[in-house]
Amino acid sequence: MEKNLVCKLVKAMELQKGEVVLLNFWGEDTEIQDLYDFVGAVAAEGAMPMTLLHTNQYERELVENMNGEVPEKWMEQFAIVDTVIDIIEKPAGLPPADLSKEKYPVFGAYLQKLFGAFSKKKKMIQVTMPSDTNAKCVGMEPEAYKERIMKALDIDYAKMKTDCQAKIDSFTGNVRTVRTGKDCVLTLDTTGREWIADAGDGALPCGEVYIAPVEEKSNGKVYFETLSVEEVGVFHDVTVTIENGHLISSTNEEFNAFLKELPENGDVVAELGIGMNPNVTGVLGDSVLDENVIGTFHIAIGMNHLFGGKNVCPIHYDFVATGIVE
């Protein structure tokens, strides 16, 4: 990624002078320059960077040779951290390909310890990078993927914040109605819940407003011209049925099989979001970007306790569609 774009992203994060920022790098040694560019950009904003590496070699050497749990003394170094920035060149949390299977539980416990500590910080920001690995994960050619990500990142962040707030302010009342297809209507109760603007200090690329609806009070149907489920498949002309906050069925048998395999509370409607990024076009099956496409909305199932809901669940799936949100 170009250094000037890194500086633009960090400026949009609105870091405070004197705060401590942990740069959590998920990538390889060949991509390490990106980390160094973030170090410089954070320092230029008056904040102080710390770094934590998660290259395949680092993770393998650490976990293969660990004896016992992560010491609390080691975890204490993160007590001073105000903001965590994940620099994601590869999917965060996946074990190294050559890690011994018997070490998987150790790796999982290590990550759980880190995520538990980081989730309590003032800000957690995830930057999806234009890497070959990320392109492969979404089934796109590297150059096309890089162009799409870079364009999505290179926006006017001040205008994005203004546009997102204007969208939030346009809603009145505590019930949102979503109209899709010819006659599909979904109602969601948002009483007591607050809209959140994702405009530069959450996930990057950004560009959405979202809310956690009351879990038991979503009812109706949603039509998807294309329903993309990460690591499961892409389905066409699908209508899903939601009753009392649960996505209970669909018109596609493969998707129904996916629903049956979800963990407890995995079918709970967890989020309503609206895409706001003018530089992202076309729903291509990449959930990181698809949910930001201007003119789309998305519903999610699974976890929402981290953004105003009460559903605790190990999964979170976003499903993007076109329609009218009132």
Where do the PLM segments sit?
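Active-site bordering "gate/hinge" segments
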Residues: 1-219, 229
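A short secondary-structure junction signal
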Residues: 97-98, 136-140, 199-201, 233-236, ...
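Short polybasic amphipathic segments
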Residues: 176-179, 238, 248-250, 321-326
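Long alpha-helical, hydrophobic tracts
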Residues: 1-10, 25, 37-47, 226, ...
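Compact functional segments
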Residues: 308-326
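Short, glycine-/Ser/Thr-/acidic-enriched flexible segments
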Residues: 28, 90-92, 131, 193, ...
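Dual-mode signal for accessory low-complexity, basic/Gly-rich regions
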Residues: 217-219, 249-310
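Oxyanion-binding "anion nests"
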Residues: 205-251
